[in-house]
């Protein structure tokens, strides 16, 4: 039932804000333990702001009231679920809708959810297959960009501090733009231009709608709208160029145009993937390398596996998939970093979790960041320990949360492969080292990032 988990995570804040406009307010009492509204108009929004983030607010709320808690966003009741047991109990029959797609497209001004359940299923399958096909076709490009970054880092003196987050975002943008859009983005200036547009749109989705600040700031709203129009215009132009064309490189757009989608549907899916995959991939690369710099034994063990599996021959996708310990490192990175800390779904009909009744049209949060740090499920939860994922029961829990296996979303599956390739290329030649006395704090937003730039150094292995 958690097939939507990762999708919904990345734009939870947008979902929270948008739902206020899509559904009438409800003050129905639920009997679920939690907070009463701090303010009549804003509900518990001031408490969320004072906590620093929605994730940190939910951590405190679940510690205080238990696994099932409630609070108010404006005049709307919100229920949060904070353990694997209560998540398993949550039932929502509307499995054909996807909160990520529905709410993101609503905020972007798109028409969503207009097809039948069968049509929606076919469209989502086409989307996932398009990601898989274009990633396979562009694997040589992924290797090329990874090796270019390796060469750049090899050229640095060992004392050079490398801005990790900046480099990972640039790397992710280069690959995603060329995989999605094609040869247009071989030009470095086009990538830089796209990065500016992408950054403006991403920074406002969720944040501005959560606190209402976007509507209150006409300058910001205008910049956001102009950036979105530029993004759409760029994508429309390339979609038109590639439709019916004969290109050497197969892209994400090419896969979509081969399906039975109209131009608007193709545009929507390109916008969604372009926005989400860049950030999720960049953050996963950043956190993975960061944790490798702070856990020397893990890095040594991963280097050993890479040397044994990849050898001196060419790196292939088949060999990357054989890196079982690397996969454990990536899973533990997602868990420890709480990469996507909150997911959400609208309760379509009245439901029940334990003794608690969840009213219809209640916004239900999945406090994944809380669940991923639950010591009853993850012993020593703050410790970075990839070996925990060698246990089958642990993998089943992780998969049930939507982070692997059947319910793993295309964007995360994409990010896993890209990160595995980059890390493999880097570790064949480099040791990744932490900068001494660096204070490293997490910033919990739609996707968890470092509050300040993450700095590392490198030295040659061979």
From Swiss-Prot:
Keyword Phosphoprotein part of the UniProt annotation: no
Residue spans crossing the bilayer: 4-24
UniProt subcellular location: Membrane
Pfam families for the chain: p450
GO molecular function per UniProt: heme binding; iron ion binding; monooxygenase activity; oxidoreductase activity, acting on paired donors, with incorporation or reduction of molecular oxygen
One annotated Gene Ontology cellular component of this protein: membrane
Record InterPro entries: CYP450_20A1-like, Cyt_P450, Cyt_P450_E_grp-I, Cyt_P450_sf
Membrane topology: Single-pass membrane protein
Cofactor(s) in the UniProt record: heme
EC assignment: 1.14.-.-
Keyword Metal-binding: yes
Alphabetic keyword roster: Heme, Iron, Membrane, Metal-binding, Monooxygenase, Oxidoreductase, Transmembrane, Transmembrane helix
Family of the protein in this entry: Belongs to the cytochrome P450 family.
Protein's UniProt name: Cytochrome P450 20A1
Residue numbers binding heme: 409
Classification via Gene3D superfamilies: Cytochrome P450 (1.10.630.10)
């Amino acid at each position: 039932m958690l097939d939507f988990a990762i999708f919904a995570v990345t734009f939870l804040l947008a979902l929270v804000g948008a739902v206020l406009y899509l559904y009438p307010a409800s003050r129905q009492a639920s009997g679920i333990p939690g907070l009463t509204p701090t303010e009549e108009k804003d509900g518990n929004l001031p408490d969320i702001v004072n906590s620093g983030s929605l994730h940190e607010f939910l951590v405190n709320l679940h510690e205080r009231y238990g696994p099932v808690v409630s609070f108010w966003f404006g005049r709307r009741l919100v229920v949060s679920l904070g353990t694997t047991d209560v998540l398993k109990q949550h039932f929502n029959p509307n499995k054909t809708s996807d909160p990520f797609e529905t709410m993101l497209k609503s905020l972007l001004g798109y028409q969503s959810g207009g097809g039948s359940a069968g049509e929606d299923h076919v469209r989502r399958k086409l989307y996932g297959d398009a990601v898989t096909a274009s990633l396979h076709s562009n694997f040589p490009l992924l290797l090329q960009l990874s090796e270019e970054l390796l060469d750049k880092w090899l050229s640095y003196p060992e004392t050079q501090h490398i801005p990790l987050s900046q480099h990972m975002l640039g790397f992710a943008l280069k690959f995603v733009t060329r995989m999605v859009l094609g040869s247009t983005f071989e030009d470095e200036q086009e990538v830089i231009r796209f990065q500016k547009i992408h950054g403006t749109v991403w920074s406002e989705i969720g944040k501005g709608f959560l606190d209402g600040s976007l509507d209150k700031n006409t300058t910001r709203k205008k910049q956001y709208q102009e950036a979105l129009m530029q993004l759409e215009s760029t994508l429309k132009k390339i979609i038109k160029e590639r439709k019916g064309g004969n290109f050497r490189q197969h892209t994400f757009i090419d896969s979509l145009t081969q399906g039975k989608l109209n131009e608007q549907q193709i545009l929507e899916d390109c916008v969604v993937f372009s926005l989400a995959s860049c950030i999720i991939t960049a953050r996963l690369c950043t956190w993975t390398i960061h944790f490798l710099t702070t856990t020397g034994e893990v890095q040594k063990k991963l280097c050993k596996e890479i040397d044994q599996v990849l050898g001196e021959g060419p790196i292939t996708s088949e060999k990357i998939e054989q890196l079982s310990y690397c996969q454990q490192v990536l899973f533990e990175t997602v868990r420890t970093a709480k990469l996507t800390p909150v997911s959400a779904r609208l309760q379509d009909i009245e439901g029940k979790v334990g003794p608690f009744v969840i009213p219809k049209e209640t916004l239900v949060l999945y406090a994944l960041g809380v669940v991923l740090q639950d010591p009853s499920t993850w012993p020593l939860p703050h410790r970075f320990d990839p070996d925990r994922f060698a246990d089958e029961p642990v993998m089943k829990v992780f998969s049930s949360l939507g982070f692997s296996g059947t319910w793993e979303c295309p964007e995360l599956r994409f990010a896993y492969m890209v990160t595995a390739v980059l890390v493999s290329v880097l570790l064949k030649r480099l040791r990744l080292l932490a900068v001494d006395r660096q204070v490293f704090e997490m910033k919990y937003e739609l996707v968890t990032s470092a509050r300040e730039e993450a700095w590392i150094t490198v030295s040659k292995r061979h």
